[in-house]
Amino acid sequence: MHEVRAGLETVALNQAMDKATEEQIRDLHHHLEEMFEAAKDGDEKFFMESDIKFHETIVDMADTTDLKKFWNMCNIRLWTAVCTKRSEKELQALAEFHVPVYEALVNKDSEHAYKTMREHFHNVSQYK
């Protein structure tokens, strides 16, 4: 599932670079800040919701109906919950894995985006 989701979100990230509005970029940053806030508070549930919103915002930025359908078929809520609960990483580290993804989008660096998204999913899939 990691590879499928990584592929979908890499495509979404690259498309989002050309289509994202300033409001969507602010929303994405807000979700990133929420992840750090949840990590600081040790609030795993809020962290997972913010994580899902972060990734969903990227998919929405791509503005592709079929991509969103496939993404929804991946059962993101369950997948995020399993990965978060089983991860050997602290919530703070999981939040930090999202920063390069955000930066790649803001900087419109498609080459870095591909590498960043692959690394992101590799990092979050490391289990106890």
Predicted regions, residues:
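Hydrophobic, amphipathic alpha-helical faces that serve as interaction scaffolds
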Residues: V4-A20, I52-E88
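C-terminal all-alpha effector/ligand-binding and dimerization domain
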Residues: T10, H29-F36, D41, K53, ...
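A general structural signal for well-ordered alpha-helical segments in protein cores
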Residues: M1, R5, E9, I25-L28, ...
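Residue-level recognition of alpha-helical structural elements
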Residues: T21-Q24, K40-F47, D63, L67, ...
